[in-house]
Design a protein with these regions (language model features):
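Nucleotide/phosphate-binding loop and acidic/charged catalytic motifs
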Residues: 92
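Non-catalytic, polymerase-adjacent accessory regions of viral genome-replication enzymes
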Residues: 1-43
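Short helix-capping/linker segments at secondary-structure and domain boundaries
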Residues: 96-103
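Conserved phosphate-binding loops in nucleotide/dinucleotide-binding enzymes
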Residues: 77-78, 82
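Intein modules and their embedded homing endonuclease domains
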Residues: 40-41, 48-51
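Conserved polymerase palm-domain catalytic core
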Residues: 52-67, 71, 103-107, 111-239
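Duplex nucleic acid-engaging cores and interfaces of nucleic-acid transaction enzymes
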Residues: 84, 88
Length: 239
């Protein structure tokens, strides 16, 4: 560890984080910098991320807000971080995910490595041969209404790295930059589109339910013995 730095963050992890972001592709954020442009000065850009994150001086820029249509009607806001910020988020994800992943319910499929919506569908189809009813529900505005304080409290239970908590707080508070250029502060919720979205939105407690105030839904999601299948906001309980 560099003795002049406050936090121990590996430069190798920062480089790996960029490779993950590059593989995922994605659009430019508020600075209009593409992955190709970022990569053209890769050494300096990765050093900048490492230097700021390891010294506690990294502050995320505004998140580019894009409205996308919902299947049920209306729109939802997709948050597009800058490439640099996506790399910083991926650094945090690479440190945090190994600690959280073993604690997740085996029937939780949303945003987990090696699992997909297709896997959730396969589990549901298999159980249709054993159970004669299915309850499907959608948690309305799940990501838009997550309580920041409760979320940070829950994440703090699963890591002893203070820099992870520090930066998650800053990401939660990063404002939206709307299409017309105006900046909108956020006091709750977490943008859909960020790299650490799943780690910020789900905890291993209570069947990985997001920090919900609706206790009956939390209870329903904990009925793992009756064939619970979770995929993002959309969930199914079979019996």
């Amino acid at each position: 560890m560099d003795k002049t730095k406050s936090y121990e963050i590996s430069k190798d992890i920062v480089h790996e984080a960029f490779q993950r972001v590059k593989e995922n592709k994605g659009a430019a954020g508020v600075d209009d910098e593409t992955i190709a442009t970022f990569e053209s000065d890769l050494t300096n850009n990765l050093y900048k991320i490492w230097n700021r994150m390891s010294s506690g001086s990294y502050f995320p820029p505004s998140v580019k807000a894009i409205e996308i249509p919902k299947k049920s009607g209306g729109t939802r806001i997709l948050g597009i971080p800058t490439v640099l910020d996506r790399v910083a988020q991926m650094v945090t994800k690479l440190y945090l995910e190994p600690q959280l992943e073993p604690l997740f319910h085996p029937d939780s499929y949303g945003y987990r490595p090696g699992k997909s919506a297709a896997d959730a569908l396969a589990a549901t189809r298999k159980r249709c041969w054993r159970y004669n009813w299915l309850l499907e529900f959608d948690i309305k505005g799940l990501f838009d209404n997550i309580n920041h304080d409760l979320l940070v409290e829950q994440v703090s239970m699963h890591t002893d790295k203070q820099w992870i908590i520090l930066y998650i707080k800053r990401w939660l508070n990063a404002p939206f930059q709307m299409a017309d250029g105006t900046v909108k502060d956020r006091t709750k919720g977490t943008p859909q589109g960020g790299v650490v979205r799943r780690e910020k939105s789900y905890t291993p407690d209570c069947g990985q339910s997001a920090i919900l105030s609706i206790q009956n839904v939390s209870t329903l999601m904990c009925i793992s013995g009756n064939g619970f299948v979770q995929s993002s906001e959309d969930n199914e309980v079979q019996n």
